Amino acid sequence: MPVISIDNLVKTFGAIRALDGLDLRVEQGEVHGFLGPNGSGKSTTIRILLGLLRRDSGDAQVLGADPWRDAVRLHRRLAYVPGDVSLWPNLTGGEAIDLFGQLRGGLDRQRRDELLQRFDLDPTRRCRTYSKGNRQKVAIVAAFASAVELYVLDEPTSGLDPLMEAVFQDEVRRVKQAGATVLLSSHVLAEVEALCDRVSIIREGRTVESGTLAELRHLTRTAVTVETARPLTGLDALPGVHDVHEVDGRTHLEVEPAHLDELLGQLVRSGVRALTSTPPTLEQLFLRHYGDDPAAGPADGPVAGAGSAGASDADSQVGAPQAGAR
């Protein structure tokens, strides 16, 4: 049974249809990337999965339960990290972490202390003195110090420096190795590419692609750079070959995977001296869907001002009690 199962999910806010028949499957033990621009429906979906919003229609199951009816029980089995963490200003970071842990039924004290050291977080400081990055660390430590079945991470590394991002990635790999499942929503495509087993790309409230990176790469073109002994002619006429041009004596082009064999035959006949073939990156797959409209529509949900480049479109709606414990 999938850890997360969504079928034909619909959610509207007045005249705005934030989710328009969304489908999503997240399997046990996988790290699943959840991608889309601001306004695509990512955070609305996550809020439904957390039991913070009620769906209009369709089906949503988390760990075999209904997230709206069984929210209290589910919150003891999952951990949530938003992209903009709000904390109680008069508590210390350590007190906030412990409170989040209590909401989930406790945390591993040894893991807590190890994570505080790894993330270089001073737990004795008041939360009001923390930078954005340190507030993120509080939620991340609280989440990863808990032995839960599901981690829901919505732009979790927003505000972290590259060293801390590397520590975060190590922790995701650790919980995966321990058998947990991770839903990771992120604008850092390199992070998703490094961590995720499968990826779902959504737009305007619908899933437009879902699969492993290898599967999705078959849906786009491969970049080829070649140097030959004899001039290349007629490449533009080959099926599936695009954007042929020369730079410094080398021919650059893109080819659809189904036509790669035919292209290679033509190249060999011209005497290949050097050839490099580069599969598409996750960023290229993403831009295939959003390159014509990077902003991709209105804000996700009814809250004005939510969403900016590099941050989740509903982060600011998540209050302190949910920051590390939902």
What are the language-model segments listed below?
Residues 37-41:
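Walker A (P-loop) phosphate-binding loop of ABC-type ATPase nucleotide-binding domains
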Residues 221-293, 302, 316, 326:
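Short, charged/small-residue-rich alpha-helical element at the C-terminal edge
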Residues 168-254:
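ABC transporter nucleotide-binding domain
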Residues 151-155, 160:
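Catalytic Walker B motif of ABC-type/P-loop ATPase nucleotide-binding domains
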Residues 54, 58-69, 73-74:
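Conserved ABC transporter NBD signature motif
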